[in-house]
Amino acid sequence: MAVEGSTITSRIKNLLRSPSIKLRRSKAGNRREDLSSKVTLEKVLGITVSGGRGLACDPRSGLVAYPAGCVVVLFNPRKHKQHHILNSSRKTITALAFSPDGKYLVTGESGHMPAVRVWDVAEHSQVAELQEHKYGVACVAFSPSAKYIVSVGYQHDMIVNVWAWKKNIVVASNKVSSRVTAVSFSEDCSYFVTAGNRHIKFWYLDDSKTSKVNATVPLLGRSGLLGELRNNLFTDVACGRGKKADSTFCITSSGLLCEFSDRRLLDKWVELRNIDSFTTTVAHCISVSQDYIFCGCADGTVRLFNPSNLHFLSTLPRPHALGTDIASVTEASRLFSGVANARYPDTIALTFDPTNQWLSCVYNDHSIYVWDVRDPKKVGKVYSALYHSSCVWSVEVYPEVKDSNQACLPPSSFITCSSDNTIRLWNTESSGVHGSTLHRNILSSDLIKIIYVDGNTQALLDTELPGGDKADASLLDPRVGIRSVCVSPNGQHLASGDRMGTLRVHELQSLSEMLKVEAHDSEILCLEYSKPDTGLKLLASASRDRLIHVLDAGREYSLQQTLDEHSSSITAVKFAASDGQVRMISCGADKSIYFRTAQKSGDGVQFTRTHHVVRKTTLYDMDVEPSWKYTAIGCQDRNIRIFNISSGKQKKLFKGSQGEDGTLIKVQTDPSGIYIATSCSDKNLSIFDFSSGECVATMFGHSEIVTGMKFSNDCKHLISVSGDSCIFVWRLSSEMTISMRQRLAELRQRQRGGKQQGPSSPQRASGPNRHQAPSMLSPGPALSSDSDKEGEDEGTEEELPALPVLAKSTKKALASVPSPALPRSLSHWEMSRAQESVGFLDPAPAANPGPRRRGRWVQPGVELSVRSMLDLRQLETLAPSLQDPSQDSLAIIPSGPRKHGQEALETSLTSQNEKPPRPQASQPCSYPHIIRLLSQEEGVFAQDLEPAPIEDGIVYPEPSDNPTMDTSEFQVQAPARGTLGRVYPGSRSSEKHSPDSACSVDYSSSCLSSPEHPTEDSESTEPLSVDGISSDLEEPAEGDEEEEEEEGGMGPYGLQEGSPQTPDQEQFLKQHFETLASGAAPGAPVQVPERSESRSISSRFLLQVQTRPLREPSPSSSSLALMSRPAQVPQASGEQPRGNGANPPGAPPEVEPSSGNPSPQQAASVLLPRCRLNPDSSWAPKRVATASPFSGLQKAQSVHSLVPQERHEASLQAPSPGALLSREIEAQDGLGSLPPADGRPSRPHSYQNPTTSSMAKISRSISVGENLGLVAEPQAHAPIRVSPLSKLALPSRAHLVLDIPKPLPDRPTLAAFSPVTKGRAPGEAEKPGFPVGLGKAHSTTERWACLGEGTTPKPRTECQAHPGPSSPCAQQLPVSSLFQGPENLQPPPPEKTPNPMECTKPGAALSQDSEPAVSLEQCEQLVAELRGSVRQAVRLYHSVAGCKMPSAEQSRIAQLLRDTFSSVRQELEAVAGAVLSSPGSSPGAVGAEQTQALLEQYSELLLRAVERRMERKL
């Protein structure tokens, strides 16, 4: 049937082509074919069906076909066997259909210039291709004669093509005016029907004409007469079969099943929902056979109707409820028993197998069920599978545990995490998991357990799939989901980090959550446990907030250290042990690599930097090869760079991708260190030889970028996960597996040699130097920085495979090994040069850890064993293990409800209320219903034997469990007589003007015909295709890094109903990986999830860092412990639930950052309000001398994020006005203006300060030490970063006692004192809606205090205050004083100004005429504030002057107030004189005169009263 090269042109080209060209091309083709055949796709765990058009069934063999990314999965429900067709074009499969004989499969794809392809099902090869669409193929169908194929394009294409695929010509074509969702051929092949938005159209084929004409003819179409249903969205259509072959059935999104007659008239319809139910409001799909009509509806409902009269027959059982614990569903009663108030996924696709009477259903949580419907009253489940419904972010293989009795999961298990907010435990081996605590469930043969992170079931549904009940995008949190997972080396703990920055640890034995802490302010990109060979039990978490937290897993995950050298997102962090030292390596989007060495620090361990390497490209991922000698880093320029861990030098570089476009996203080495696998943003996977850099295999099949990869422990598989929600299990070639196992055997041989020459040690080591790591912690490693140009280092790199020195040193090292080593002692490079012939050894005994698991799940590789549940050895293992964990395992925290008083979390982490333990999934031991004898593999590489057929394994419900409904609940309705005749009288004029007519309606009218799904019909034409991703991933310039990251919601990972997978849907890379570099560039904020409170470790660390005058080493757990627990406050402070929005009630709207760099005066405004509102803090005198004007700028803090906090603090601390002012003055005294000791401003230390990474970028040639903050020259103040933390309400931070030094920043500015103008120029108008009554208790007094000193700062000028202990200017000016800028405040006479430097002069004040008009409201507010402030001043003076034995400080306060009163009186007299001496004025001036007179009169009365009372007391 092959038609490739069948045209005349191609035949001539083949004849004229020379044999040499043919030979060269065939060699290149063979090379490519050889690379792609090394690794084969064995299993797909995922489904990307987007509607009824994406699911098909072979009517003869029963094969079910569905898309999974760029792969078509051919599934046999009877044998549970998969076959795969890979789309070599790398375009997502959107629609497919079988030919009537089942030999061929037609597929449609998305993207630009998509193709309709015909595949040979048996050969899995392409036989024909048509490329006549532009923007995606919506649906395809074979004609019953298999002669024609109909394909319909997406809305922006709107082309209907009839293709004679064997001749490779389009015989008929036309356009449609509406979005088409489905197509169906009539049984006699005379017409086909398309359905869509307000669209049912019948297209007629004249076979006599199309067969005679070789050119394309117009396709004739007639619209269906919809009558009163013309405004509906028809989601699916199916032509009748058998006796109803002349009828056409379709469903609407509103839940109607309609029947059209052969005259295209709407004959009758029935409402799919019954009277008493509200769950089936939406219908998605339909499937029609001779006996049944199946309608897929919302909430997992499938209705069965009789096609002859549309009478209701029955309702199929619903699938699992959302949030079901599948490990507990081990019996049929658990599946078919309804759960009260449960929510079920929608049915989005149906296909019927008439031979077996099986109905396959796909639901919008990406699950698939096959139901046996031979008896509609007793429906049984044949097969089911549950998959991730959104992007899969990470995959981890369950480690090989030395003591198999301590293993929590069976061998070959792996763990994935996803944006659907679940962590899933998988095991694809054919043998059962009955030896573990988890039994096989009846819902999935591959899925062991689902860990639901929270109770939100909305994340389990794919909202991009069709459905009328789509969730509002504003209600969905775009950062929901688990971003990274990691399993502890002993297999007991599972750590996970979500996209909100929360770190969780689950205990795998009971699958209960044992720890939950808000560790970061942004998503956690990487988690890593240290190996036991390091002697440490550490967990490192790295985040987009550029911080690394190191937790001690052996001490209940207490915080050991926080590292902040990186200046951007950290993409990877790894532990290693080399040269007797424990190392930590991290890389990130700031193009830096840090090599750190562990040092003993009291009871814990601290990491200090030893090497710092900077490259010119973003570093996306890193892995350490098994010998821990070298680390491989995947870079943005598609290169893999190999670094020596001990020296930090680059040793090798090779290309990590076969393509010329894209970016390396992930790198992963195999267990032996021979191969390294890479994933590129062009969606391709490659495997390279680690020593030579030669590509040995390539793979493709994912429709989105691969976000994670792992080799299996048995060296037989590579598991890849992707943004398309699919998991691919790849089978490696036999020679690759042999080479890896041979390398592991050589390592075991060397390990045994080391054992004979050295005493054994309780420490388990895997290399000559690993066991020494705990005792060889460096007291102070030498610092180095490799920031030279990359070319120089690479030009002098050493060829590691050609170094015989390594082999010699290896032999010496082996001779001195004092403890047993793991089979990963030496790198492949060293082994390849050792020239030792070690054959493929027999597996080691069970006591020796090797690549083969030993214990209760042992699977012999040679002999054929028959195993069953009746085996005595298996029965013994069914009893729960009561043995204590091994000594090297992590301490297991009890999984019960945890209290706030646990020591570890008191000292380092914020205590959290933990959930009660989940019930164990294990059920009481019982014999299975079916005993299968499963044979094991014969040899290592024999294909898995197929499981036994399951005719008897269908799960049926109890008779009482089957829901029955009265047929009368579904009433068939028909249009009234004359209705259709009145609307459509049969004249052709009405048909010509039908909205569905392609001939009479303008092409652009389709934009008005899809109101129900506006987002589905929109499509961006921006060329962002991943195929040309190299242009999108160009390294940003330094200036570009200043741009703010705009990361929107999560990009769609599945297919979208009604719109193709065009470039706007392929922004996955740009949204989640390219933004790693731009998100945390200097001057741009790190995009942080919105929280009502910020309790994360990162926030507390950044808050504490603000108190450091110079950059110091990161705090240990003891130093951070002081800030870990906020003070207890009344519940009135109001913890707002997460997701309530950016602003708390009464909080100001967000202030947009200015385009220019904020001035230092604006920068100072971050510190002062915090200092003033913590007057009772114990100030640290040791830091007075090192204080600087900007040393208090805190990291990750916005200039306008303090406003809601300030109001919150003011509400918590509400003493009497006199006491409040006295406290403020005490705060002044503690914050007096002292310049730095050297007379120069110290460098600022805010969140955007130059980190080690950014300094290395600025100056690559200098050698940077650890104390980079000790710079003598004054540094330019870094611009204030408007962090998204500004969106948070910060009540918890308000109670932390800040260790801020006493000296106030020298010469504070007006912008520093106003809580309203943070982030704005002083004269900028206030945004409307801001509460103006903020801080009335302080504001006027503060202004009077400042006026008493005679300082009236102008915009962007500085005010010099007294350098003494009392600095009245260190108060805040009122809100009202900023309505028109500080010019409203009249300055005092020059002779009365006590400061040596005057900020303004009387003549500098603006005239009244040049000012905007003062409103009455403003004036009244000013008067009220003035009265309140004077009262407060008087009360304060009375309280101070009334003391019989005043202290020196009280005497100073009294003198200060007297001077202030005198100064204010003189000011008012001067103002009154100016007003009286002015000539006739305008009406506006008259109002000003009245105001001034009123103020003068009132002030004089108050002052006289004060003087009288003072005279009485004196």
UniProtKB/Swiss-Prot annotation:
Q: Where is this region: Disordered?
A: 748-804, 880-925, 951-1256, 1299-1336
* GO terms, biological process: negative regulation of canonical NF-kappaB signal transduction; negative regulation of defense response to bacterium; negative regulation of interleukin-8 production; positive regulation of JNK cascade
Q: Where is the composition biased (Acidic residues)?
A: 789-800, 1032-1048
Q: What is its main location?
A: cytoplasm
Mark the WD repeats by their residue spans: 88-129, 132-173, 175-213, 276-315, 342-381, 387-436, 477-516, 519-561, 565-606, 614-653, 659-698, 701-740
Which residues lie in Low complexity bias regions? 996-1011, 1113-1126
Q: Where in the cell is it found?
A: Cytoplasm; Nucleus; Cytoplasm, Cytoskeleton, Spindle pole
Quote the SMART domains the UniProt record gives. Answer: WD40
Which intervals carry biased composition (Polar residues)? 905-925, 961-971, 1188-1200, 1245-1256
**By its UniProt entry, which InterPro entries does this protein fall under?**
MABP1, WD40/YVTN_repeat-like_dom_sf, WD40_MABP1-WDR62_1st, WD40_MABP1-WDR62_2nd, WD40_repeat_dom_sf, WD40_rpt, WDR62-MABP1_CC
Its function, per the record, reads: Negative regulator of NOD2 function. It down-regulates NOD2-induced processes such as activation of NF-kappa-B signaling, IL8 secretion and antibacterial response. Involved in JNK signaling pathway.
- Complexes and interactors: Can form homodimers (via C-terminus). Interacts (via C-terminus) with WDR62 (via C-terminus). Interacts with MAPK9. Interacts (via N-terminus) with NOD2; the interaction is enhanced in presence of muramyl dipeptide (MDP). Interacts with MAPK10.
Q: Which disease is it linked to?
A: Nephronophthisis 20: A form of nephronophthisis, an autosomal recessive chronic tubulo-interstitial nephritis that progresses to end-stage renal failure. Some patients have cystic kidneys of normal size and no extrarenal manifestations, whereas others have enlarged renal size and severe extrarenal defects, including hypertrophic obstructive cardiomyopathy, aortic stenosis, pulmonary stenosis, patent ductus arteriosus, situs inversus, and periportal liver fibrosis. NPHP20 patients do not show extrarenal manifestations or evidence of a ciliopathy, such as situs inversus or polydactyly.
Entry text on domains: The N-terminal WD40 domain is necessary for the interaction with NOD2 and down-regulation of NOD2 function.
The name under which this protein is listed is Mitogen-activated protein kinase-binding protein 1
Identify the species of origin. Homo sapiens (Human)
- Name of encoding gene: MAPKBP1
